[in-house]
Amino acid sequence: MFAQDAAQTGEQTTQNQGENGNNFVTEAITNYLIDDFEFANTWQASMPRDYGVVSIIRREGGPADVVAEGAENNKYILGAKVEYFRTGYPWFSVTPPRPVKIPGYTKELSVWVAGRNHNNRMSFYVYDVNGKPQAVGNEALNFMGWKNITVQIPANIRQEEFRGQVEQGISFMGIHVKVDPRDSYGKYYIYFDQLMAKTDMYLETYREEDDPLDTW
């Protein structure tokens, strides 16, 4: 399912000990479920046509840690299969049917990945608060089995706009994989589960509800 709140939510208040010792920073950290891939067949995949074809599948399975948390609600994963036509520097991406708006100020993105020990690298693609596309992370996929990949959102990706009343935060666009030319032959398989965001909901919680949004 898309964009559901996970169970773990907590508000944290920390004190910045400045000269007066009375500067407080408040955070309301939430683990936000972007997609659990129970409807993975609604996703799409793409790659340059002259390098090969990529297809996706919804199939049963998942990392043991995730399945153990709720077997009835965590039955399916997203799988992608690439069939290369020739070697080179191709890429492929998997994307949801539409961008997913993540509420609040996103601290990090994470996803469980089942790798096949290829030298490929993975990034998240997002829109910033102004709709500008951005790539986040450059994570190695040279491992076997399931691994939870977590990427911090850098400060240079704009998530707040205080000169108008707009929806704050970023939107998730998809997962992008750059293929190492040494591995761009034959077939390649990769699987994903439990796409999450760790987000600070403080700004959303304390936004004035009667202030209209500048989204028209």
From Swiss-Prot:
Location in the cell reads: Periplasmic flagellum; Periplasm
Q: Which Pfam families match?
A: FlaA
Record's compositionally biased regions (Low complexity): 8-22
Q: Would I find Transcription regulation among this entry's keywords?
A: no
Q: Cross-referenced Gene3D superfamilies, in alphabetical order? A: Galactose-binding lectin
Q: Which domain of life is it from?
A: Bacteria
Q: Which UniProt keywords apply?
A: Bacterial flagellum, Periplasm
Q: What's an example GO BP annotation here?
A: bacterial-type flagellum-dependent cell motility
Q: Does the keyword Nucleus apply?
A: no
Please give the residue ranges the record annotates as the region Disordered.
1-22
Task: State the practical use.
Answer: Has shown promise in a 4-component vaccine with BHWA1_00430 (AC C0QY54), SecA (AC C0QZS7) and BHWA1_00569 (AC C0QYX7).
Q: Which GO terms describe its cellular component?
A: outer membrane-bounded periplasmic space; periplasmic flagellum
Q: What does this protein do?
A: Might be part of the flagella.
Q: What is this protein called?
A: Putative flagellar filament outer layer-like protein
Which organism does this sequence originate in?
Answer: Brachyspira hyodysenteriae (strain ATCC 49526 / WA1)
Gene name of the record: flaAL
